[in-house]
Amino acid sequence: MAYFNQHQSMISKRYLTFFSKSKKKKPFSAGQLIGLILGPLLFLLTLLFFHPQDLPWEGVYVLAITLWIATWWITEAIPIAATSLLPIVLLPLGHILTPEQVSSEYGNDIIFLFLGGFILAIAMERWNLHTRVALTIINLIGASTSKILLGFMVATGFLSMFVSNTAAVMIMIPIGLAIIKEAHDLQEANTNQTSIQKFEKSLVLAIGYAGTIGGLGTLIGTPPLIILKGQYMQHFGHEISFAKWMIVGIPTVIVLLGITWLYLRYVAFRHDLKYLPGGQTLIKQKLDELGKMKYEEKVVQTIFVLASLLWITREFLLKKWEVTSSVADGTIAIFISILLFVIPAKNTEKHRRIIDWEVAKELPWGVLILFGGGLALAKGISESGLAKWLGEQLKSLNGVSPILIVIVITIFVLFLTEVTSNTATATMILPILATLSVAVGVHPLLLMAPAAMAANCAYMLPVGTPPNAIIFGSGKISIKQMASVGFWVNLISAIIIILVVYYVMPIVLGIDINQPLPLK
């Protein structure tokens, strides 16, 4: 266990170091300084010189705000969350929305859904339930190198549906490194060193990629999907339920995990090592060290199952009862969170209750503010007439094959998110796609869903996602190798996303992809 803890600490330090290298002591990097000046400059230039006859002044003003905010989001001139507070100042200043209207977007039901999801995830991490779940899955799948690789991917993918992708990978990487070290230490005379090295590279990448892929399974799995849910409701007044998205998302995750596993095992890192020395023994040892399931773990497990059942049954059961007919996914998330605050813990030396308010220090408030800022900006775009004007300009695309548009959007966003924040990318591009759907005469989810899913998928560069940074920080993989392997995983993801959105999603969600929805 000491080795496990030592490597978890080592990975954490490398992960933090990786993201702090460029900051040093300077207040702004060159790119940030350019963005800091360019954002307000674009705002002023738009107000002064951009005056189309068919766009009211309010629309010009919101376009100027959007350019400013988008520039600061892309360049991270100031923290992304701080940029997301600009609508609170700028929208009332231009008399687009009242302060009350803007502020209400930061308390949207979607934000509380994600807040509750975060609290549940932190409860799992606090009482170590996530580690037990991961080790149990790996132990059940098998002992061969192929099965160990698959086991790690399934465990990481499952965890990242409910805890952050970063947390899921941070849990699994030290376990993976411990298995690799054990294999090197117990290496037999007839074992090929090259095969072990190929296996360790495939295992490290498999954990990182599975952490990213798993986020597509549920609405709380990754920020772009929450943004999709919010923007879809904001622009069209329709809801994507937690349960229905799972029917779309989980098969997508299963297929993507399966194909990525086959690619890593039999194409990218093909080797002759059938069984890993000491692999299964180490997994069982880690499980034994956890001991019997503790009271607190059982409580969190029960609450987790309850939350899942409520989210899954809300659409076809809770909505039919008068008492619970107005319950939303966010309502369920907060109800579950309150239960965690109420139930006492037996291990009072550690914590008095399952969750206490110390959890506030661990919550990603910045992400929640970003969601609110995106929703506020989307409302401004709608109320100012900018959305309608953009739709008119995009009508020139009418007649272009919808599948071609989906392919272009998916590939564009997928490679864009390699160098930009996935949350910022989704927040910027989804309102544009909502308007584009009206212009080209297709259902908005045909364009918005692949963009949100693609925004989550970045496999080529360490800066693409936190999981990529973590696995790069392990020292087992080079940027060149990550880019080479990740490029093909990007293409695999693009193909699966396009097929799912075009052929599976319409059936599950009951939509006609050729039927546009009117903007609110």
From Swiss-Prot:
Specify the signal sequence span. Answer: none
Instruction: Note the InterPro entries from the entry.
Output: SLC13A/DASS
Species name for this entry?
Staphylococcus aureus (strain bovine RF122 / ET3-1)
Q: Which residues cross the membrane?
A: 30-50, 55-75, 77-97, 104-124, 160-180, 207-227, 242-262, 298-318, 323-343, 362-382, 399-419, 428-448, 452-472, 491-511
One Pfam family name from the record?
Na_sulph_symp
The protein's job, in short, is: Mediates the transport of the dicarboxylates fumarate, malate, and succinate across the cytoplasmic membrane via a Na(+)-electrochemical gradient.
Q: What is this protein called?
A: Sodium-dependent dicarboxylate transporter SdcS
Alphabetically sorted, this entry's keywords are: Cell membrane, Ion transport, Membrane, Sodium, Sodium transport, Symport, Transmembrane, Transmembrane helix, Transport
Q: How does this protein lie in the membrane?
A: Multi-pass membrane protein
Gene Ontology biological process terms in this record = carboxylic acid transmembrane transport; sodium ion transport
Establish whether keyword Transferase is in the entry.
no
